[in-house]
Amino acid sequence: MDYLDLGPYSSASGTVRLPGSKSISNRVLLLAALAEGDTTITNLLDSDDTRVMLDALGKLGVKLARDGDTCVVTGTRGAFTAKTADLFLGNAGTAVRPLTAALAINGGDYRVHGVPRMHERPIGDLVDGLRQIGAQIDYEQNEGFPPLRIRPATISVDAPIRVRGDVSSQFLTALLMTLPLVKAKDGRSIVEIDGELISKPYIDITIRLMARFGVNVEREGWQRFTVPAGVRYRSPGRIMVEGDASSASYFLAAGALGGGPLRVEGVGRASIQGDVGFAHALMQMGANVTMGDDWIEVRGIGHDHGKLEPIDMDFNLIPDAAMTIAVAALFANGTSTLRNIASWRVKETDRIAAMATELRKVGATVEEGADYLVVTPPAALTPNAAIDTYDDHRMAMCFSLVSLGGVPVRINDPKCVGKTFPDYFDRFAALAKA
């Protein structure tokens, strides 16, 4: 098996310019493809997940011109020209869910599939929502999961669409992004959420980006959303993708554990991403954090004892960045509890089970629940642990931080970081010092 040995390191400092946000990149690509006019996207993330979105849009007849991290997208004015396509979307939830909705109203014959893990990630609540407006979608294998067959259908919105909010916020994102293109009585579509909506900051990203393309969604709390119907997205001309706040979390944690100063550029106070909230969680644990509009800097830990404080927190709003907290908890002077993280179980892998297994390898005592994790750090980290990454980019990036505990660590299958951050380990090694 391919592996990478890291550390032992005793410090980390420097500056890192973040790659573009995955969540923003794939939303902007789809909005630009559906809009009227040409959109120049800058700082577009180059990774597995954005590549599958670009490949899919190309197969659907969208004209794309790429040059480095810039892409010019010629909009289709609301309808893809290709009426048949077989789309392989890897393990990219940010591509599968929104594209499924866009294709369901496009009047064509499409197949949507991915890697085996994607076929274990739920999509039934989105399909149920789309069927409420007339979509013809069939499951090829297991009910509620890809692969999907999408067929031409007569689409109309005659009543509020109900969708569950407690599995993935991407179902709501997919509906919100597609509904402006559908005619509805009263000139508007309404989406109502059953249960608690998780990952609310990701919905905020969706709504803000739709507004950049000229469509304004109104919301009543987080339970009811009103979308103008039968309208066109209009290109904003140019749009810059801000840095990936989830990716920032590893470097910010490294700045705390390795003394810093370590600065990330590309996200800050002005970010539209909820995962900048990671910086506040890190502050709560005692890290010295300062922020500008588009940068965050960490300078070690503010306690004489040099350890982080344990944390007990609800991470429903920032589930991806919370993984970094789970590994940072190895460096706390007590037991930490991560709550309300049930969504981890349906991500790239079952992240609660995977995290518990790998934390134990480095000596932690871990209690795992349906939607929580309790981490008690060891007196000393176990050196030379071989960390399995489960084809999950975030597992690989999180566990690089163990090397800052003065012990070497082995990361198996390090190339899985290609999903969002292909050169992560090069960037990390440039900042970490023995």
Swiss-Prot record:
UniProt keyword Transferase present: yes
E.C. numbers: 2.5.1.19
Compartment list: Cytoplasm
Catalytic activity, reaction form: 3-phosphoshikimate + phosphoenolpyruvate = 5-O-(1-carboxyvinyl)-3-phosphoshikimate + phosphate
Binding site for phosphoenolpyruvate: K22, G93, R121, Q170, R351, R394, K419
First-tier enzyme category under EC: transferase
Binding sites annotated in the UniProt record for 3-phosphoshikimate: K22, S23, R27, S168, S169, Q170, S199, D320, K347
Pfam families given in the database record: EPSP_synthase
Pathway per the UniProt entry: Metabolic intermediate biosynthesis; chorismate biosynthesis; chorismate from D-erythrose 4-phosphate and phosphoenolpyruvate: step 6/7
Biological processes per GO annotation: amino acid biosynthetic process; aromatic amino acid family biosynthetic process; chorismate biosynthetic process
GO CC list: cytoplasm
Active-site residues per Swiss-Prot or TrEMBL entry: D320
Keywords linked to the UniProt accession: Amino-acid biosynthesis, Aromatic amino acid biosynthesis, Cytoplasm, Transferase
GO molecular function: 3-phosphoshikimate 1-carboxyvinyltransferase activity
Function: Catalyzes the transfer of the enolpyruvyl moiety of phosphoenolpyruvate (PEP) to the 5-hydroxyl of shikimate-3-phosphate (S3P) to produce enolpyruvyl shikimate-3-phosphate and inorganic phosphate.
Subunit architecture: Monomer.
Family: Belongs to the EPSP synthase family.
Name listed for the protein in its UniProt record: 3-phosphoshikimate 1-carboxyvinyltransferase
Lineage: Bacteria, Pseudomonadati, Pseudomonadota, Betaproteobacteria, Burkholderiales
Annotated gene: aroA
